Amino acid sequence: MELEVPDEAESAEAGAVTAEAAWSAESGAAAGMTQKKAGLAEAPLVTGQPGPGHGKKLGHRGVDASGETTYKKTTSSTLKGAIQLGIGYTVGNLSSKPERDVLMQDFYVVESIFFPSEGSNLTPAHHFQDFRFKTYAPVAFRYFRELFGIRPDDYLYSLCNEPLIELSNPGASGSVFYVTSDDEFIIKTVMHKEAEFLQKLLPGYYMNLNQNPRTLLPKFYGLYCVQSGGKNIRVVVMNNVLPRVVKMHLKFDLKGSTYKRRASKKEKEKSLPTYKDLDFMQDMPEGLLLDSDTFGALVKTLQRDCLVLESFKIMDYSLLLGVHNIDQQERERQAEGAQSKADEKRPVAQKALYSTAMESIQGGAARGEAIETDDTMGGIPAVNGRGERLLLHIGIIDILQSYRFIKKLEHTWKALVHDGDTVSVHRPSFYAERFFKFMSSTVFRKSSSLKSSPSKKGRGALLAVKPLGPTAAFSASQIPSEREDVQYDLRGARSYPTLEDEGRPDLLPCTPPSFEEATTASIATTLSSTSLSIPERSPSDTSEQPRYRRRTQSSGQDGRPQEEPHAEDLQKITVQVEPVCGVGVVPKEEGAGVEVPPCGASAAASVEIDAASQASEPASQASDEEDAPSTDIYFPTDERSWVYSPLHYSARPASDGESDT
């Protein structure tokens, strides 16, 4: 394994994946560069004469003299060719190796292969400059692709068989984006710190996908590096959130922040601008209305994903939302006429599993409920405030931003000038809470008037909204929203009470612990469950008939063990209990058995309560109240512990000779 050449300073922040229509040769790249913000730094490139757009840079992305996009002074055509050559070799070589389980060391493996321009016995000849291609964690990423149903030949066909298409509206991150011709995958250039963070994230990402592959988080299919001319260009292959075959009428990048979260004037001049939080609140005050089942599944998925991101200390992520307006498209088709209908091609659905928005949030897979996604193209059915039918394509993006020192400084500086709770850069816990609250209460809302259609067998698992017809529409007053009565808590044990667990384990606990805390708790639980002789709870133990904690003192003058309440810091009451059956005291030491009188013995039980007022009431009055069950294990000072439950022992009638004391 060879050492990598250090990169030049990489200071540009990662931005949103803002994909729209297909890119068309150099003209698309030149047009995209003219729409950038006016304040971009200008620096001349090494080669070529200045031309239109020459010298404009955003991060490492620029334009050369011919108008072609460059990244780290490497032309886009050269980068695309190197990526396709490298992936074709590495994936093909890996497919010849036998499959095996993923090991811990597999997450840190880096394979490297040299591609000379004249070719070698392992690599083909090419007309690019010599380069070295590195593949990170090939075995681990092969497992991820298999988990999402992506076969090696399909992966190679999508990435290497057809030319990659550069997106003309890449956003403000300074990255270059490519999409495959079949709309399956997005290739994005990432910075050194982002690639390094993804490598550290892989073990936890592996655990996350194992527990729940249905997530709105990005699906990473590969991490690669092209090394040429002393430059390292790292790229990541991900799922495509916004398919090009579906026309997006609106596009939003939402974070739950309000500080400078409005699309700029230059952005709004684009053919498909990326709007932000304040734009959404202004243009869609009623939010996006979903039926009950869809809303519940979406909220549950968002809650789980936010807890995962918080546990990894990830922040500054966004929800990419693409809105396809069905009614608007039908009106556009009617205006254009039926002349183009005969030539229209029906779009092909994406092949990867869990890649669409509907598949990412579906919660009924365990019950076998599904719908056919041909009509929705994987979008989530919704209705806006005007009653227009929509299809939503959503995904969480830009998760490779950890809360590092520079982010802490950025938030501190912004908080001094503006309200600290409104800026987008924030600590991970607060960021997750604000993000989840904004999405579950402002962006998405539950509508009781939307009914679910009967389920069909297919790839999706949620129930779709019934078609309302091409001319059907509801007014905002006819579509009630249930936003005001329900508040959703990110860390609540059950934030959405109508959801069931579906037989799947939760991804993370309500309050995500650190790795050290989780390990310590696991060891402590194992030791306590294996070393303590604790009777199992019988089926007859219910909430109405629980077990209680009791403590015994040494025998009194009459030889009977005396039960007395012990002084504790907690508030307590003393309850007099007269059992009608015999109870045995089992001390911790083996062989030391003490017998309790069969009946009639007065016993004092110490029961902990929370209310301070009840602690001062008489014992006779407190004994009439319902006893509080004990849920923990108590170890008395005299090293005796026993559990009393009348249902655990056979009842024995009291003899006539026994009397109450």
UniProtKB/Swiss-Prot annotation:
| Primary residence | membrane
Topology relative to the lipid bilayer, per the entry, is: Peripheral membrane protein
Annotated region (Mediates interaction with TLN2), positions in chain = 636-661
Q: Where is this region: Disordered?
A: 44-69, 525-572, 605-661
**An example Gene Ontology molecular-function term:** ATP binding
Query: What does the tissue specificity note say?
Result: High expression in brain. Also detected in lung, thymus, heart, testicle, kidney and embryo. Highly expressed in forebrain, in particular in cerebellum, hippocampus and cerebral cortex.
Residues modified to N6-acetyllysine: 265, 268
GO annotation terms (biological process): axonogenesis; chemotaxis; exocytosis; phagocytosis; phosphatidylinositol biosynthetic process; phosphatidylinositol metabolic process; platelet aggregation; regulation of postsynaptic neurotransmitter receptor internalization
Query: Which is a Pfam family this sequence falls into?
Result: PIP5K
Ranges of compositional bias, category Basic and acidic residues = 560-571
InterPro entries xrefs: PInositol-4-P-4/5-kinase_C_sf (IPR027483), PInositol-4-P-4/5-kinase_core (IPR002498), PInositol-4-P-5-kinase_N (IPR027484), PInositol-4/5-P-5/4-kinase (IPR023610)
- Phosphothreonine carried by residues: 661
Which residues are annotated as modified residue Phosphoserine in the UniProt record?
Answer: 554, 645, 655, 659
Q: Where in the cell is it found?
A: Cell membrane; Endomembrane system; Cytoplasm; Cell junction, Focal adhesion
Which reactions is this enzyme annotated as catalysing?
a 1,2-diacyl-sn-glycero-3-phospho-(1D-myo-inositol 4-phosphate) + ATP = a 1,2-diacyl-sn-glycero-3-phospho-(1D-myo-inositol-4,5-bisphosphate) + ADP + H(+); 1-octadecanoyl-2-(5Z,8Z,11Z,14Z)-eicosatetraenoyl-sn-glycero-3-phospho-1D-myo-inositol 4-phosphate + ATP = 1-octadecanoyl-2-(5Z,8Z,11Z,14Z)-eicosatetraenoyl-sn-glycero-3-phospho-1D-myo-inositol 4,5-bisphosphate + ADP + H(+); 1-octadecanoyl-2-(9Z)-octadecenoyl-sn-glycero-3-phospho-1D-myo-inositol 4-phosphate + ATP = 1-octadecanoyl-2-(9Z)-octadecenoyl-sn-glycero-3-phospho-1D-myo-inositol 4,5-bisphosphate + ADP + H(+); 1-octadecanoyl-2-(9Z)-octadecenoyl-sn-glycero-3-phospho-1D-myo-inositol + ATP = 1-octadecanoyl-2-(9Z)-octadecenoyl-sn-glycero-3-phospho-1D-myo-inositol 5-phosphate + ADP + H(+)
Q: How is it modified after translation?
A: Phosphorylation on Ser-645 negatively regulates binding to TLN2 and is strongly stimulated in mitosis. Phosphorylation on Tyr-644 is necessary for targeting to focal adhesions. Phosphorylation on Ser-645 and Tyr-644 are mutually exclusive. Phosphorylated by SYK and CSK. Tyrosine phosphorylation is enhanced by PTK2 signaling. Phosphorylated at Tyr-634 upon EGF stimulation.
Keywords for this protein? Acetylation, ATP-binding, Cell adhesion, Cell junction, Cell membrane, Cell projection, Chemotaxis, Cytoplasm, Endocytosis, Exocytosis, Kinase, Lipid metabolism, Membrane, Methylation, Nucleotide-binding, Phagocytosis, Phosphoprotein, Transferase
SUPFAM superfamilies recorded: SAICAR synthase-like
Q: What is its EC number?
A: 2.7.1.68
Omega-N-methylarginine modifications at: 459
| Annotated ranges, domain PIPK | 75-443
Instruction: Report the outcome of residue 634 to F.
Output: Cannot rescue the effect PIP5K1C knockdown on EGF-stimulated cell migration. Does not affect lipid kinase activity. Does not alter binding to tailin. Decreased tailin assembly into focal adhesions. Increased interaction with PLCG1
Which residues does the record list as Asymmetric dimethylarginine (modified residue)?
A: 459
Q: Which residues lie in Low complexity bias regions?
A: 525-534, 605-622
Q: How does it assemble?
A: Isoform 1 interacts with TLN1. Interacts with TLN2; interaction stimulates 1-phosphatidylinositol-4-phosphate 5-kinase activity. May compete with beta-integrins for the same binding site on TLN1 and TLN2. Interacts with ARF6. Interacts with AP2B1. Isoform 1 interacts with AP2M1; phosphorylation of PIP5K1C by CSK disrupts the interaction; clathrin competes with PIP5K1C. Interacts with CDH1. Interacts with CSK. Interacts with PLCG1; interaction is abolished upon EGF stimulation.
What is the protein name stated in its UniProt record? Phosphatidylinositol 4-phosphate 5-kinase type-1 gamma
Q: Which organism is it from?
A: Mus musculus (Mouse)
The gene name reads Pip5k1c
